[in-house]
Amino acid sequence: MKVQASVKKRCEHCKIIRRKKRVYVICKVNPKHNQKQG
């Protein structure tokens, strides 16, 4: 999981999820796209 200042969808399978005041991008098709804002 990459930690980035701004998270963006990188493909059509990515989903933006908010958990515990953090923003995540989760992608089951391509796990390289997983990101966390921090």
From Swiss-Prot:
Keyword Endoplasmic reticulum on this protein? no
GO CC annotation: cytoplasm; ribonucleoprotein complex; ribosome
Keyword annotations for this protein, in alphabetical order, are: Ribonucleoprotein, Ribosomal protein
Disulphide bridges, residue numbers: none
What's the superkingdom here?
Bacteria
Asked whether the keyword Ribosomal protein is assigned, the reply is yes
> Would you kindly state one Gene Ontology biological process term found in this protein's UniProt entry?
translation
Query: Could you tell me one molecular function GO term of this UniProt entry?
Result: structural constituent of ribosome
Alphabetized InterPro entries for the sequence: Ribosomal_bL36 (IPR000473), Ribosomal_bL36_sp (IPR035977)
The family annotation for this protein states: Belongs to the bacterial ribosomal protein bL36 family.
Q: What is this protein called?
A: Large ribosomal subunit protein bL36
The gene designation is: rpmJ
